[in-house]
């Protein structure tokens, strides 16, 4: 809608004032296209795989306490590329059991608890973007979401944390570049 309004304004300005006056609006339209682009991704057909929720780089991997589920876990932190795609995707297929609920920490309201059909718990945390704009989360309690499906948007990128079960096998290392929905960051392990 925003793109359509910008294009219409550019055409009107072009008609009445000429090309030089309309160039800023055409530039704005191009910027909107770049910021809101959302390419299709090839989602791997591996049921126990955990795919990257965002385009970016792995900045840290640590064993830590999951503040949402109060359990020991592996935390994979991703820094989104400021010029990349800003759509976030579900790392696993499963059911949303807990919406953003904690108000103790400014980062915590954007945590989502996903439980797979096998009973594995994954927490996806979307943190504020570079302009401190709140992430948009499109999923709610009780929703079922597919692996690699769109679940949110962070304006101009930000940081994402994925809390995995402690027994997960990692497929990435610090410094790796990953694409949302298509690159595997871990595999869930069952005894």
Which positions does each model-derived feature cover?
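Contiguous, well-folded functional domains in the mature portion of proteins
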Residues: 1-191
